[in-house]
Every structure is written in C-alpha cells, then in structure tokens.
Amino acid sequence: MEKPSDSKNSSISVNYFLNSAAYSGLFSLLSVILTGQVSATSSLCVGLALGVLSLFSRGSTVFIGGLIERSSTVSLTETGFGFIVFSLLLLQPAMGGFIGFLFLDLALLGLGLSLVNFALRGHIIARVKDKKSQAALFALVTMTANLGSAIGPLASNYIYKAFGQTLFVIVIVGLYVFSALLTPIVLTHHVFIRNEKSSKENTSSIVKTITDSLKSPGTVLAILAVFVGSIMNGQLFAGMALEFHSLSDSPVIRGLFYSIDAISVIALQMPVSKLISRGMANGQNATSFIIKSLGIYGISFALFACGVSSYWWICIISLAVFSIAECIYAPLINIALVEAQPDKPLVDILNYRLIIAAIGESAGSFLGGWIVPALRPAGMTAWYWCALALVGIIPAVVSNQIGKRGQRIIRR
C-alpha cells in the first residue's frame, strides 16, 4: 500500500488539530455549563451527566465492532461528526428539559466523539502499513493534537467570558462542521478497519479474557491500578474544571490551566519515557510504574487541595505534577494489561482496556461532577481532593515498601 503524501499527512494533522481544539475547548467549560443550569435540580444529576458522557466517549465503539468493520473510515468519521453537531445543537434545550433527555443527548455526543477518534486512528493504521511511516504520522498528529489542546481552552474561555454561552457553542459547532467538510478531502476513500478474526470470535474471547483475569492476582492488580488511574484522569474535565472556573474571573487564567497540562505533557513525555525505559531494563514491569503514577496523581491532588482555597498558582504547580503522572500512566496501560495476560489475543486486551478506562473515567467524572458542586457552598472541596490524594499515595507507598522488602530478601 502506498504511503500517503506529505500534503495528506499535513491535512490529517490539521483535522486532528481542529478536533483537539474543539474537544478541549468544549470540555474545559462543559462541566461549568452543566453545573450552572442543571445543579438547581441536583449536583448528583451533574455528576451522572458527566459520567454518561465519559462512558460513551471512551467505550461505546467496543460494542459496535461489527458496524465499524462494515463501514469505511470516511463514513464512520462523518457519522461521528453528525452525532456531535446534532447533540451540541440540542444541548441547550436538553439542559432545560427532562433530565433523561440530557443523558441521551450527552450519550449521543459521547458516541460521536468515540467514533471520530476511533475512525481517525484506525484510518492511519489501515492506510499506512510501513511501521516507521506510521509512527512518524502518529507523532505528527499527536503533536498537532496537543497544540490544539493548548489553544482550545484559552480561546474557549475567552469567548465564553466575553460573548456568552451561545456564541461559544456556535464556535465549537463551527469547528466540528468544518472538520466534517474537510474529512472527505483529507481521508482516502474506501479504507476499512478490519480485524483478522470475526466479530463473533472476538466477542466470545473478550468475555473469556475478562473471566480469566479474575483468577490471577497479578492481573487483578494490573486492572485495579489501571482502573484507579482512570478515575484520577477523569477529574481533569470534571471536578478540576469546576474548581478552575471558581478560582479566577480571568478567561486567560482559566484557559491557562488546561494549556499548562497540554504543554507539560509535550515537554515531559520524552524524558519521562526514558526514565521508564531505564526502569524496565532493570526489571520493573509496567504495573509497578502505573502504581507509582497513582502516587504522583495523589501528590498532585494534595497540592490541588492547598490551591483551591484561592491560591491559583499552587493549582498550576499541581497541574505540572498531574502531567508527570499522565506521562507515566497513559503510555503503559496497554503494556500492563498485555504483561498480565500475555496469552490472550491483542484485540481483546485493547477492547478490555477501553472498557476499564471507560468505567474508571466515567466514575471519576461522576464523582467530580457530583461531589465538588455539593461541597463548594460549605467551602469543603479540599477534603475531596485530600481523599483522592490518599487513594493514590497509599498504594504507591505500600508497593514501594513491598518492593524494598523483596530486594532485601533477595540480597540475603
């Protein structure tokens, strides 16, 4: 199969940039918008709404594998954009009506986001067969996506503050419409994402993979570590977003919180990856690094608890620490699950990973979207972040002590 031209590569990266800018801009304010218009009913409803969105945006494609295999990447991407635009246009009436309608609307939004992300990644894998070219293209689109993640929140917070919610939604919708129009030009037509095995075989084997995982302590440990890490990750666009919005009236500072996270990940990923490689060469496995990342998430939340009392600059420091944890956690999820179950089909492990991340991030979004608005009137949100800090730090400390004890026994 031919390598895509440089112009095609550049066009795909533009699409990634637009999607990332729209996504990060939308999610940096969505929890704030929902809290402002739905929390009058119940802060629990806000948490449930964010949980539904996270669940569908992370894991919905796992359950429509047959449809995905029968559709071209262009069709999948256009369908996803259609769902996104339609759901955003319905968002305002959905927030003012029956809460179940809001849940359905956010589920549709999540499905659209999931389809677009899955189809774009799948298109690159299916179209570019040369591994070096594939890696180079993924590096390019990751860089442009991170750039979009840095710019999107700054622009969105400025537009929201200066011109209001209606124009903000129009701009986000406009970005997705433009991306949809760009898709048939950017993507090669008649490209399909196909698995080597049939959907029936995949379905039966993933069920067996889940069942078998519960029989192995090592696998259960890896699953729990990944699950807790995904809960931590789910805080960024839920509880943390609500705190950011209340810390400053400046749209620049509000947007800066998210931009710092994106920029920090860009700057830190390579040096952190080198440290991980060195540790693995010395015998450490991926699960042990993920548990370490939980401790770093915990430190981040402990700092964040100190900052939410109005010291926004401490929150900036906590975000930099949060980014270090992301740099460790995100690249190692697949590796940890494969290490724990090396005899299982890779496609099942990848789907399994999506399910764990979807449930974990949904739980994190739900907790942040529910508890933070509930505790804020009493000025007690710091307790929530302290509790999360303990959830991350305790396993990391225990794991470290067990590791040291094991090394002493080996030396003796």
Regions from the language model: what does each represent?
Residues 60-72, 160, 268-285, 372:
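Helix-to-loop junctions at the C-terminal end of transmembrane segments
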Residues 161-176, 372-392:
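A membrane-interface helix-boundary motif in multi-pass transporters
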Residues 2-54, 220-258:
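Helix-loop boundary and gating motifs at the non-cytosolic
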Residues 1-9, 190-222:
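Juxtamembrane intracellular "pre-TM" segments in multi-pass secondary transporters
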Residues 54-62, 149-150, 262-266, 270, ...:
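Residue-level signature of mid-helix packing/kink "hotspots" within the transmembrane helices
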Residues 82-97, 295-309:
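C-terminal ends and interior cores of transmembrane alpha-helices
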Residues 107-144:
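Cytoplasmic helix-loop-helix junction between adjacent transmembrane helices
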Residues 344-375:
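A late C-terminal transmembrane helix in Major Facilitator Superfamily
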